[in-house]
Amino acid sequence: MAHKKAGGSSRNGRDSESKRLGVKRFGDQQVLAGNILVRQRGTPFLAGINVGTGRDHTLYAKAAGKVQFVRRGPKSRTYVDVVTN
């Protein structure tokens, strides 16, 4: 005979792996060309001066310099710039 009553089987207990999104290099930080600045879904941040956009909307530095976050344009969107030295 069983020593314990049978435990129920739950159908929960799964979760997706975190995608490590977010800002990777903050304002006034020095970066090299190719450094990832922001990983994002969609475009909360837009590519500014010396910044490129990847297929998955990742922003990366096209030149070495200092990172700047600037709000501009008619909708006051946030742009990420890399200001060269």
UniProtKB/Swiss-Prot annotation:
Endpoints of the signal sequence: none
Molecular function terms from GO: structural constituent of ribosome
Keywords from the UniProt entry: Ribonucleoprotein, Ribosomal protein
GO cellular component: cytosolic large ribosomal subunit
Family designation: Belongs to the bacterial ribosomal protein bL27 family.
Family annotation (HAMAP family): Ribosomal_bL27 (MF_00539)
Protein name per the record: Large ribosomal subunit protein bL27
Organism listed in the record: Nitrosococcus oceani (strain ATCC 19707 / BCRC 17464 / JCM 30415 / NCIMB 11848 / C-107)
